Protein backbone atom coordinates (compact mmCIF):
# COMPACT_ATOMS: atom_id res chain seq x y z
CA UNK A 1 0.00 0.00 0.00
CA UNK A 2 1.21 3.48 -0.82
CA UNK A 3 1.87 5.76 2.13
CA UNK A 4 -0.86 8.13 3.28
CA UNK A 5 0.77 11.55 3.52
CA UNK A 6 -1.06 14.31 5.39
CA UNK A 7 -0.20 17.95 4.93
CA UNK A 8 -1.93 21.23 5.63
CA UNK A 9 -1.61 24.36 7.69
CA UNK A 10 -0.82 24.15 11.40
CA UNK A 11 -3.99 23.35 13.30
CA UNK A 12 -5.64 21.62 10.33
CA UNK A 13 -5.68 18.26 12.14
CA UNK A 14 -2.71 16.42 10.63
CA UNK A 15 -1.52 14.78 13.85
CA UNK A 16 -4.98 13.95 15.22
CA UNK A 17 -6.32 12.62 11.93
CA UNK A 18 -3.04 10.85 11.18
CA UNK A 19 -3.26 9.01 14.49
CA UNK A 20 -6.85 7.94 13.73
CA UNK A 21 -6.01 6.73 10.21
CA UNK A 22 -2.99 4.78 11.47
CA UNK A 23 -5.04 3.17 14.27
CA UNK A 24 -7.90 2.20 11.94
CA UNK A 25 -5.52 0.66 9.39
CA UNK A 26 -3.23 -0.80 12.06
CA UNK A 27 -0.14 0.81 10.53
CA UNK A 28 2.52 3.15 11.91
CA UNK A 29 2.25 6.93 12.07
CA UNK A 30 5.40 8.92 11.37
CA UNK A 31 5.19 12.59 12.37
CA UNK A 32 7.93 14.58 10.64
CA UNK A 33 7.91 17.34 13.28
CA UNK A 34 8.45 14.68 15.98
CA UNK A 35 11.36 13.29 13.96
CA UNK A 36 12.89 16.77 13.73
CA UNK A 37 12.45 17.27 17.49
CA UNK A 38 14.28 13.96 18.09
CA UNK A 39 17.13 15.01 15.82
CA UNK A 40 17.64 18.44 17.42
CA UNK A 41 16.60 17.39 20.95
CA UNK A 42 14.71 20.71 21.09
CA UNK A 43 11.09 21.79 20.58
CA UNK A 44 10.10 23.27 17.20
CA UNK A 45 9.84 26.65 18.91
CA UNK A 46 13.39 26.31 20.31
CA UNK A 47 14.76 25.15 16.94
CA UNK A 48 13.38 28.28 15.25
CA UNK A 49 14.62 30.51 18.08
CA UNK A 50 18.14 29.06 18.30
CA UNK A 51 18.85 27.86 14.75
CA UNK A 52 16.31 29.71 12.58
CA UNK A 53 13.84 28.56 9.95
CA UNK A 54 16.58 27.77 7.40
CA UNK A 55 18.19 25.10 9.64
CA UNK A 56 14.74 23.74 10.49
CA UNK A 57 13.88 23.36 6.78
CA UNK A 58 17.25 21.67 6.10
CA UNK A 59 16.55 19.12 8.84
CA UNK A 60 12.97 18.72 7.60
CA UNK A 61 14.31 17.86 4.13
CA UNK A 62 16.62 15.17 5.59
CA UNK A 63 13.68 13.73 7.53
CA UNK A 64 11.50 13.74 4.38
CA UNK A 65 14.26 11.98 2.43
CA UNK A 66 14.33 9.27 5.10
CA UNK A 67 10.61 8.78 5.79
CA UNK A 68 9.60 8.91 2.11
CA UNK A 69 11.44 5.59 1.68
CA UNK A 70 9.19 3.88 4.23
CA UNK A 71 6.28 1.77 3.08
CA UNK A 72 2.75 1.24 4.36
CA UNK A 73 2.76 4.12 6.87
CA UNK A 74 0.86 7.32 7.58
CA UNK A 75 3.16 10.35 7.36
CA UNK A 76 2.05 13.55 9.06
CA UNK A 77 4.13 16.46 7.77
CA UNK A 78 4.80 19.97 8.98
CA UNK A 79 2.66 22.65 7.35
CA UNK A 80 5.54 24.15 5.37
CA UNK A 81 6.86 20.91 3.88
CA UNK A 82 5.08 21.63 0.57
CA UNK A 83 7.10 24.82 0.02
CA UNK A 84 9.97 22.66 -1.28
CA UNK A 85 8.92 20.88 -4.50
CA UNK A 86 11.60 18.25 -3.90
CA UNK A 87 9.89 17.29 -0.62
CA UNK A 88 6.60 16.84 -2.47
CA UNK A 89 8.24 14.74 -5.19
CA UNK A 90 9.92 12.51 -2.59
CA UNK A 91 6.68 12.01 -0.66
CA UNK A 92 4.68 11.37 -3.83
CA UNK A 93 7.05 8.63 -5.08
CA UNK A 94 5.71 6.18 -2.52
CA UNK A 95 2.66 8.02 -1.23
CA UNK A 96 -0.59 9.81 -1.88
CA UNK A 97 -0.70 13.36 -0.49
CA UNK A 98 -3.85 14.56 1.27
CA UNK A 99 -4.21 18.29 1.97
CA UNK A 100 -6.19 18.92 5.16
CA UNK A 101 -7.91 22.27 4.76
CA UNK A 102 -9.19 24.45 7.58
CA UNK A 103 -10.28 28.09 7.32
CA UNK A 104 -8.10 30.76 8.94
CA UNK A 105 -10.86 31.41 11.50
CA UNK A 106 -11.03 27.75 12.55
CA UNK A 107 -7.24 27.50 12.68
CA UNK A 108 -7.21 30.53 14.98
CA UNK A 109 -9.83 28.87 17.24
CA UNK A 110 -7.85 25.64 17.34
CA UNK A 111 -4.55 27.40 18.10
CA UNK A 112 -5.80 30.20 20.37
CA UNK A 113 -4.11 28.81 23.48
CA UNK A 114 -1.05 27.45 21.66
CA UNK A 115 1.98 29.70 22.05
CA UNK A 116 4.46 27.19 20.62
CA UNK A 117 4.01 28.11 16.94
CA UNK A 118 7.06 30.17 15.95
CA UNK A 119 5.56 31.52 12.73
CA UNK A 120 2.58 32.97 14.64
CA UNK A 121 4.48 34.54 17.54
CA UNK A 122 4.73 38.13 16.36
CA UNK A 123 1.81 40.36 15.47
CA UNK A 124 -1.84 39.53 14.99
CA UNK A 125 -2.33 35.75 14.82
CA UNK A 126 -5.22 35.84 12.33
CA UNK A 127 -3.32 38.18 9.98
CA UNK A 128 -0.28 35.90 10.17
CA UNK A 129 -2.40 32.81 9.46
CA UNK A 130 -4.02 34.48 6.43
CA UNK A 131 -0.67 35.75 5.12
CA UNK A 132 1.02 32.34 5.45
CA UNK A 133 -1.98 30.49 4.01
CA UNK A 134 -2.01 32.79 0.98
CA UNK A 135 1.65 31.94 0.36
CA UNK A 136 1.15 28.19 0.85
CA UNK A 137 -2.24 27.64 -0.79
CA UNK A 138 -0.92 27.18 -4.36
CA UNK A 139 1.43 24.49 -3.00
CA UNK A 140 -1.35 22.80 -1.00
CA UNK A 141 -3.59 22.80 -4.08
CA UNK A 142 -0.95 20.69 -5.84
CA UNK A 143 -1.69 17.77 -3.48
CA UNK A 144 -3.57 14.69 -4.67
CA UNK A 145 -6.73 15.12 -2.56
CA UNK A 146 -8.24 17.84 -0.37
CA UNK A 147 -10.10 17.06 2.86
CA UNK A 148 -12.05 19.93 4.46
CA UNK A 149 -11.62 19.63 8.24
CA UNK A 150 -13.97 22.57 8.81
CA UNK A 151 -16.94 20.39 7.92
CA UNK A 152 -15.69 16.94 8.99
CA UNK A 153 -14.89 15.73 12.48
CA UNK A 154 -11.45 14.11 12.84
CA UNK A 155 -13.15 10.69 12.79
CA UNK A 156 -15.07 11.42 9.58
CA UNK A 157 -12.00 12.97 7.95
CA UNK A 158 -10.02 9.81 8.79
CA UNK A 159 -12.79 7.63 7.34
CA UNK A 160 -12.89 9.72 4.15
CA UNK A 161 -9.11 9.47 3.70
CA UNK A 162 -9.20 5.70 4.22
CA UNK A 163 -12.11 5.35 1.78
CA UNK A 164 -10.36 7.39 -0.93
CA UNK A 165 -7.06 5.62 -0.33
CA UNK A 166 -8.50 2.11 -0.46
CA UNK A 167 -10.42 2.90 -3.66
CA UNK A 168 -7.22 4.26 -5.21
CA UNK A 169 -5.23 1.22 -4.04
CA UNK A 170 -7.76 -1.21 -5.52
CA UNK A 171 -7.15 0.35 -8.96
CA UNK A 172 -3.36 -0.08 -8.83
Curated annotation (Swiss-Prot):
It catalyses: shikimate + ATP = 3-phosphoshikimate + ADP + H(+). GO terms for cellular component: cytosol. Gene3D superfamilies: P-loop containing nucleotide triphosphate hydrolases (3.40.50.300). Pfam families: SKI (PF01202). GO terms for molecular function: ATP binding; magnesium ion binding; shikimate kinase activity. Its EC number is 2.7.1.71. Its cofactor is Mg(2+). CDD domains: SK. Binds 1 Mg(2+) ion per subunit. Keywords: Amino-acid biosynthesis, Aromatic amino acid biosynthesis, ATP-binding, Cytoplasm, Kinase, Magnesium, Metal-binding, Nucleotide-binding, Transferase. Pathway: Metabolic intermediate biosynthesis; chorismate biosynthesis; chorismate from D-erythrose 4-phosphate and phosphoenolpyruvate: step 5/7. Monomer. Catalyzes the specific phosphorylation of the 3-hydroxyl group of shikimic acid using ATP as a cosubstrate. Belongs to the shikimate kinase family. PANTHER family: SHIKIMATE KINASE, SHIKIMATE KINASE 1, CHLOROPLASTIC. This is Shikimate kinase. It comes from Caldicellulosiruptor saccharolyticus (strain ATCC 43494 / DSM 8903 / Tp8T 6331). The gene is aroK.
